Amino acid sequence: MSGTATNGRRVVVTGIGVVSPLAVGAELTWKRLIEGQSGIGRITHFDPSDLPAQVAGQVPDGPTAEGGLTLSDWVPVKDQKKMDRFIHLGLAAAIQAVEDSGWKPEDEDDRCATGVMIGSGIGGLQTIYDGSLTVSSGKARRLSPFFIPSALINLISGHLSIRYGFKGPNHAVVTACATGVHAIGDASRLIQYGDADVMIAGGAEAAICSLGIAGFCSARALSTASNDDPTKASRPWDKDRDGFIMGEGAGVVVLEELEHAKRRGAKIYGEIGGYGMSGDAHHITAPAEGHEGAFRAMKAALRNSGGLTTADIDYVNAHGTSTMADDLELDAVERFFGEDAKRLVMSSTKSAIGHLLGAAGAVEAIFCLQAIRDGIVPPTLNLDNPARESVIDRVAHVAQQRKIDVALSNSFGFGGTNASIILKRFKD
Amino acid sequence: MSDIADKVKKIVVEHLGVDESKVTPDASFIDDLGADSLDTVELVMAFEEAFSVEIPEDAAEKIATVKDAIDYIEKQKAA
């Protein structure tokens, strides 16, 4: 038996979709990412003047062909007001992924073997804010009947299943900033266990609203030092980093059982090579010293990788949010890789797009697949003066050409939840 | 067509995203204009807001067509 372990059923990725501050579209986002572009700018979704943090990674409006968001290309106008923005962005990424995969269930068996697991860290925050204003102004009876289904996190999965007739498992993950990795990892296990042959999986987030920014500001999590120079604000591992930059967007993949993908001649981006989880049991927002939870998540991912070792892993897409916790993750990665750390490259793509919270892990897993496909490692922007030295090459400023066969992506969330996923080049 | 009928028609077009030509007096919101039960709840709220009338739930349940809505609102306004 080769590949991942359970039941011998191997899981490959056959479609990708991205909505990010760099572009709507997986390939345009990737192109701009490896060119070293930044998607961070001053917040325009609302007036942030009253708040200490005033920059974010917002999805650009514009024609679809130029990588902008034209919502009516993804969601019919009459349905748009029934969904919060996080659902809009999630659907735009999911539709891209499904179309990219070419998978169209032909009969009832196919439909029942195709499921959806797209989550979000926070869900419809702007919708909840607006709804509470309606109620507090004495107009409770005027609250839209679409208020609840607009805000519920599992409604991306719901809407997508209705659109395409996917009748398999319909699920959604909510684990803060680990959502995207948990969704892809858990969905791959549903395929391994035979609950589905195809799963559409990922995460979406749209929390750049006054309530979202104010909340993370109060938690002292956001950068406030670079309001006048937004593209410099997200600087993972740099000594001048001072908090994360909120991003919005979505990442969705089509996961497919290998034989199913082969039978229909699907294009294969790569294989799910391992997946591990852990809990910190330490603090609601801060990781433990040495980030031992991250260490255990990476160890767990390797344990069910079908025999991979740290020597096989070429690239780590770090959680690296541009906060004090960056160096704790670095500690954990160094300890985990030991001697193999010397040949490792690791970057944080949050330097270019900010932290997409529940979408981050899914978008970053897609970057890993693109890095494997193209032999290019995306850069860590703004890493001018590392806060501490490391034997690990953190790909400062510019992308590197390098053969990548196996990549690992880390995501950690509030509450002390950790997830690591391994993506590897597909070999039959 | 009365002002009320005009305004009702406009609200229906806007909320259900249908072509104006389909919004005939006899058109049923659910059977002809593609609304679901939540759409009709929202539609009634929009009528209440636009015409400053109260439409109690038992009355709202009987509003199935464009004409039903126009008639109900005209009656409220005349009273």
From Swiss-Prot, chain B:
What PROSITE patterns does this protein's entry cite?
A: CARRIER, PHOSPHOPANTETHEINE
Q: In which pathway does it act?
A: Lipid metabolism; fatty acid biosynthesis
What are the record keywords, sorted?
Cytoplasm, Fatty acid biosynthesis, Fatty acid metabolism, Lipid biosynthesis, Lipid metabolism, Phosphopantetheine, Phosphoprotein
| One Pfam family here | PP-binding
Q: Give the subcellular location.
A: Cytoplasm
Which GO terms of the cellular component aspect does the record hold? cytosol; membrane
InterPro entries tied to this protein: ACP, ACP-like_sf, PP-bd_ACP, Ppantetheine_attach_site
Gene Ontology biological process terms in this record = lipid A biosynthetic process
What happens to this protein after translation, modification-wise?
A: 4'-phosphopantetheine is transferred from CoA to a specific serine of apo-ACP by AcpS. This modification is essential for activity because fatty acids are bound in thioester linkage to the sulfhydryl of the prosthetic group.
GO molecular function terms attached to this record: acyl binding; acyl carrier activity
Q: Does the keyword Heme apply?
A: no
The record ties this protein, via SUPFAM superfamilies, to: ACP-like (SSF47336)
Q: What does this protein do?
A: Carrier of the growing fatty acid chain in fatty acid biosynthesis.
Which family is this sequence assigned to? Belongs to the acyl carrier protein (ACP) family.
Check the record and name the HAMAP family matching this protein.
Answer: Acyl_carrier
Q: Which PANTHER family match?
A: ACYL CARRIER PROTEIN, CARRIER DOMAIN-CONTAINING PROTEIN
- What NCBIfam families does the record point to? acyl_carrier, PRK00982.1-2, PRK00982.1-3, PRK00982.1-4, PRK00982.1-5
Q: What is this protein called?
A: Acyl carrier protein
Gene for this chain: acpP
